[in-house]
C-alpha cells in the first residue's frame, strides 16, 4: 500500500499503534500527549488523527470513542515504521536472543524424536511471543539424480538437462556473460568444456538424492568451471523445491488457550472456527504458511506478515499471521510462525519468528 505520510503523521500513527497494542483501548489525543513526547498539542494530534482516519489508516469503533488502527494502518506500521529510528531495537534484540538461547539450551536433539523437538520449539516460541506458535514438520523428496547434461544451444546460452530416477526430464536455460578469455572459445571449445563438466558431475553425483544435491557447496568446482557454479546451485535447488512432497501436513501448535483469552476473541463462534482450523483443517493452514514469498532470495528466509483481511482463510481474517521458512542448506523445508490478533506487538513477533527460523535452519543444515 503506497501512502505517503509526513514525519508528524508517521510519528502519530506509530504512537497510536503502540498505545493500542499496549492497552487494547481506543486511543485519544490526550493519551498520546500524556504518554509520548510528540512535541505537539492535543489539538494538533486530533487533526492529524482525523487525516489518518480519512486515509483509512485509523477508524473509530464508536462515535464517542478514540481511534484504533485499521488493517491498512498496521500495514503501514509494519512496512514503514518498524525502523531503527522508531522501534525499540534493544527490546526486540533481547527477545530474539532469549528465543535463540532457550532453543539451544532446552531442546535435546540427541535424546528426543524430531516431533518432540519441534513441539518443544513451538512451546518456547509461544511463551516468548505471547502468540499461538506454528511449526511445520520438515518436508523431503525421494527423487534421485539419474543423469545431468550441460549443452550449448546458442552463443552465450546454455541449457541444463536433469533426468531423475523416475525418468522425469527437467531443463533450465542460462545466459553466460563470458570473460575476455572465455569469449575466445569457439562453439567447439565451449561444447568440449560443457562435456567435461557434465561428465565430472555425473561421475560424482549420479545416484544421490536431489535433497543432498541442493545442499552441496558448488564452489568446489574446479576454478575454470566456477562460472557455472551459481547456475547449477540455483537450478538444482529450484528443481528440488518442485519435488518436495508434504510427507505430513502436521503443524505443531502451542499457546492457543492464552491467546484466545484476548479481548479480540470474545465471540465464541469466532474462537470455534479458529480452533477448528488449527486442529481439524491443518492442511489448509499448512499450504498457507509454507508458501514461500516470491521475492525471497535463494538461501535467505524472509519474514512474511499477513494482516487481517490479507489472510485468505476466513477463520483468521481478523488475525495476523507472521511466518518464515527454515531451510536445509538453500532449500526451504519447513515453516515457523505465530498467529495472534491484529493488535499484535509486531516488532517483537517479527524478531522472534526470524530468530526461530534461523535456529532451525542452522540445526537442519
UniProtKB/Swiss-Prot annotation:
Gene Ontology BP, a term: negative regulation of DNA-templated transcription
Keyword set, alphabetical order: Repressor, Stress response, Transcription, Transcription regulation
SUPFAM superfamilies in the record: GAF domain-like, Winged helix' DNA-binding domain
GO molecular function terms noted in the UniProt entry: DNA binding
Source taxon at top rank: Bacteria
Cysteine pairings via disulfide bonds: none
UniProt similarity note: Belongs to the HrcA family.
Function of the protein: Negative regulator of class I heat shock genes (grpE-dnaK-dnaJ and groELS operons). Prevents heat-shock induction of these operons.
PANTHER family, A to Z: HEAT-INDUCIBLE TRANSCRIPTION REPRESSOR HRCA (PTHR34824:SF1)
Protein name: Heat-inducible transcription repressor HrcA
Amino acid at each position: 500500500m503506497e501512502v505517503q505520510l509526513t514525519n508528524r503523521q508517521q510519528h502519530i500513527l506509530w504512537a497510536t499503534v503502540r498505545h493500542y497494542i499496549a492497552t487494547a483501548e481506543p486511543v485519544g489525543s490526550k493519551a498520546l500527549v500524556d504518554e509520548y513526547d510528540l512535541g505537539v498539542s492535543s489539538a494538533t494530534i486530533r487533526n492529524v488523527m482525523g487525516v489518518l482516519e480519512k486515509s483509512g489508516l485509523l477508524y473509530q469503533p464508536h462515535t464517542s470513542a478514540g481511534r484504533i488502527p485499521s488493517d491498512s494502518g498496521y500495514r503501514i506500521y509494519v512496512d514503514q515504521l518498524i525502523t531503527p529510528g522508531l522501534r525499540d531495537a534493544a527490546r526486540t534484540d533481547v527477545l530474539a536472543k532469549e528465543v535463540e538461547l532457550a532453543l539451544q539450551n532446552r531442546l535435546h536433539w540427541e535424546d528426543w524424536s524430531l516431533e518432540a523437538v519441534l513441539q518443544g520449539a513451538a512451546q518456547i516460541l509461544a511463551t516468548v511471543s505471547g502468540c499461538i506458535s506454528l511449526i511445520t514438520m520438515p518436508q523431503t523428496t525421494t527423487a534421485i539424480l539419474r543423469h545431468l547434461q550441460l549443452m550449448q544451444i546458442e552463443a552465450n546460452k546454455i541449457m541444463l538437462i536433469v533426468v531423475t530416477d523416475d525418468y522425469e526430464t527437467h531443463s533450465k536455460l542460462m545466459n553466460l556473460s563470458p570473460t575476455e578469455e572465455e569469449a575466445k572459445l569457439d562453439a567447439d571449445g565451449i561444447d568440449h568444456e560443457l562435456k567435461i563438466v557434465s561428465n565430472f558431475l555425473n561421475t560424482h553425483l549420479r545416484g544421490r538424492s536431489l535433497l543432498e544435491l541442493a545442499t552441496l557447496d558448488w564452489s568446489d568446482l574446479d576454478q575454470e568451471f566456477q562460472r557455472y557454479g551459481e547456475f547449477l546451485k540455483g537450478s538444482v535447488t529450484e528443481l528440488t523445491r518442485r519435488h518436495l512432497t508434504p510427507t505430513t501436513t502436521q503443524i505443531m501448535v502451542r499457546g492457543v488457550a492464552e491467546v484466545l483469552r484476548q479481548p479480540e476473541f470474545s465471540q465464541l463462534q469466532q474462537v470455534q472456527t479458529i480452533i477448528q482450523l488449527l486442529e481439524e483443517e491443518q492442511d489448509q493452514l499448512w499450504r498457507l504458511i509454507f508458501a514461500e514469498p516470491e521475492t525471497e532470495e535463494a538461501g535467505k528466509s524472509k519474514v512474511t506478515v499477513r494482516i487481517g483481511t490479507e489472510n485468505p482463510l476466513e477463520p483468521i481474517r481478523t488475525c495476523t499471521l507472521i511466518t518464515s521458512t527454515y531451510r536445509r542448506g538453500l532449500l526451504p523445508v519447513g515453516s515457523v510462525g505465530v498467529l495472534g490478533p491484529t493488535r499484535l506487538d509486531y516488532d517483537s513477533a517479527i524478531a522472534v519468528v526470524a530468530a526461530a527460523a534461523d535456529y532451525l535452519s542452522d540445526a537442519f543444515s
